[in-house]
């Protein structure tokens, strides 16, 4: 990050660190730009395990068409601890988000679908339904596990 050391009291991220492949470099850079006593807080999508995603998760990521570099809670814990952070906390939000995503899928497939298709195009809405079906599946399996991440620079 193009900031001087110790520039910030807080670094916050929402749904963006999923696109950074090197979580150790991320943690080190966040640590560098925080002032002593500073906090890191993020909400992002994690994968439940280290290593390659399952076929179902790979198909979901492919459907999204994004460059996800998902890491496990353990990988984040290790990266932030090794960078020097204390009080590293990861809170799994899968149960909450699974419920939300399932309701969104029901809505996409329900009575609103025709109007959505008229407004946004049938092909687009059909693709959204495909994505949400895959998303709900990997959420239900627990492999896709959105988390809140918090850590403190001593």
Which sequence ranges carry the predicted segments?
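A short acidic, Gly/Pro-enriched loop at the edge of an enzyme's catalytic core
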Residues: 1-11
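A short hydrophobic/small-residue beta-strand
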Residues: 40-41, 87
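Short alpha-helix
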Residues: 68-84, 90
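Conserved Class I S-adenosyl-L-methionine
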Residues: 89-154
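Alpha/beta-hydrolase-fold catalytic nucleophile elbow
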Residues: 14, 43-44
């Amino acid at each position: 990050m193009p900031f001087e050391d110790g520039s910030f009291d807080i670094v916050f991220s929402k749904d963006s660190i999923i696109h950074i492949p090197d979580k150790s470099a991320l943690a080190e850079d966040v640590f560098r730009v925080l002032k002593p006593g500073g906090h890191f807080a993020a909400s992002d999508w994690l994968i439940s395990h280290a290593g390659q995603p399952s076929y179902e998760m790979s198909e979901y990521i492919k459907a999204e068409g994004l460059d996800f570099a998902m890491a496990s809670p353990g990988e984040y814990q290790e990266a932030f601890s090794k960078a020097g952070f204390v009080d590293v906390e990861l809170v799994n939000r899968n149960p909450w988000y699974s419920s939300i995503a399932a309701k969104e899928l029901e809505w996409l497939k329900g009575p609103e679908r025709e109007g959505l298709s008229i407004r946004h195009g049938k092909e687009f809405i059909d693709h959204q339904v495909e994505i949400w079906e895959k998303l709900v599946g990997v959420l239900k399996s627990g492999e896709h596990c959105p988390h809140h991440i918090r850590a403190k620079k001593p």
